[in-house]
Amino acid sequence: MADDAADPKGNPIGTELVYEDDSVRVWRIELAPGETAGWHTHYLDYTTVVVEGDLVERPNADGSVDRIEVKPGAIMRWNQGTLRHALRNIGTKTFRNVIVEVKGRQTGA
């Protein structure tokens, strides 16, 4: 199931695909301090829920890098995009996040 849920280049969106039905796909991501999740692109609108962590860095394919302070309980909604990125835990705590991708939604809907 995870292979079908990967981005078109074969890279998974999270560490583990934990649920999928016709409406949503739910990922868990866990990164120890210093660990990096591979390059991927989100092709669906999605929402993230921070479970644990403090600071992550998102290197983008265009060369830019975003530093993001995260707090447990924070919820962020993102539109699908075409910018490939990775995610690196540059904090002191394990980063744990839940990603909920919404199937069949158009960006901005």
Give a label for each model feature.
Residues 1-13, 105-109:
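Basic/polar N-terminal segments that are highly enriched at the extreme N-terminus
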Residues 10-39, 45-48, 99-100:
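A short glycine-rich, His/Asp/Glu-containing loop-to-beta-strand
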Residues 37-39, 57-58, 84-91:
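Short beta-strand His + acidic residue motifs that chelate non-heme Fe in jelly-roll/DSBH
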Residues 43-62:
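Glycine- and acidic-residue-biased ligand/ion/polar-headgroup-sensing regions
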Residues 62-81:
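Short acidic-glycine-tyrosine-enriched beta hairpin
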Residues 80-105:
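Ligand-binding loop in jelly-roll beta-barrel domains
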